[in-house]
Amino acid sequence: MAVARHGYRPWGSILGLLGLALAAAAAWDVASLRCTFGSFCECDFWPDLPGLECDLAQHLAGQHLAKALVVKSLKAFVQDPAPSKPLVLSLHGWTGTGKSYVSSLLAQHLFRDGLRSPHVHHFSPIIHFPHPSRTEQYKKELKSWVQGNLTACGRSLFLFDEMDKLPPGLMEVLQPFLGPSWVVYGTNYRKAIFIFISNAGGEQINQVALEAWRSHRDREEISLQEVEPVISRAVMDNPQHGFWRSGIMEEHLLDAVVPFLPLQRHHVRHCVLNELAQLGLEPSEEVVQAVLDSTTYFPEVEQLFSSNGCKTVASRLTFFL
């Protein structure tokens, strides 16, 4: 089976898990000497919340709800020396609105080695769970992987991408790890973080944003109370979603449903300018306009929201530079 991060991991192998646990335990003996002088340092967990807030403010365009929810949830969780349960966030929205970008920022600002940290585990259904006929096998392997890595390091981050494409029933094995029990399978898991990413609810979020625009309401006036119920319904009614009959939503195990609003033309401009800055290039209005004009927008009449958010900005830039 494929691996959960860069390189190859024997995550379906019991011996591999034991080896990982022993290696992590040995590393912890050394790290613990250094971490006794820090408040949060466990494994390579080095939270930089001010840095996260700064990056979100500078680089995440048009997402007032996502910024507020992510920062508030993380602050409360990280500053609690004995959290009652793991932090569980579910990110929802249209393609290219910043869900994957935010998850990468979380890894970058929570762990010293970011996405390269051995305690950050990124799962993709296409890579790790490609065959629905093997769901029972995947369930056993996923349970062993999560349990083994939480035994090695309680401060672990698990990212599950494209929840819409996961085999139905797979996520039910995670339910015991997401609640407030003290110990599961001999493992204390309350300091773990689980992030779920999906497009589910994206169309419904878009409709809320469109209706707000048609009513001449400011985008920032859109509240969580408006979008959270429509996201929940979209997920609960979708048998193709990873949460389908998993008990995760039914048991209210999500700490926050994080909506990502569709991006308008000026938000895409922000992304273009950010990309130019990262490339070390001076902003060119001609190039910016070319990228914006080559982007498709919807609905057909209003031409208000980018069809791909900021997802294709980098590739379009290379064409016009």
Swiss-Prot record:
Pfam families recorded: TOR1A_C, Torsin
Expression sites (tissue/organ): Expressed at similar levels in liver, muscle and brain (at protein level).
Residues that, per the record, bind ATP: 93-100
Keywords, ordered alphabetically: ATP-binding, Endoplasmic reticulum, Glycoprotein, Nucleotide-binding, Signal
GO biological process: chaperone cofactor-dependent protein refolding
Keyword Glycoprotein: yes
Glycosylation sites (chain numbering): 149
Matching Gene3D superfamilies: P-loop containing nucleotide triphosphate hydrolases
Main location class: endoplasmic reticulum
GO CC annotations, alphabetized: endoplasmic reticulum lumen
Source superkingdom: Eukaryota
Repeat in keyword set: no
Post-translational modification summary for this protein: N-glycosylated.
SUPFAM superfamilies in the cross-refs: P-loop containing nucleoside triphosphate hydrolases
GO molecular function: ATP binding; ATP hydrolysis activity; identical protein binding
Subcellular location per the Swiss-Prot or TrEMBL entry: Endoplasmic reticulum lumen
InterPro entries the UniProt entry points to: ClpA/B, P-loop_NTPase, TOR1A_C, Torsin, Torsin_1/2
Signal peptide (residue range): 1-26
Family named by the database record: Belongs to the ClpA/ClpB family. Torsin subfamily.
Quaternary state and interactors: Homohexamer. Interacts with TOR1AIP1.
Protein name: Torsin-2A
Underlying gene: Tor2a
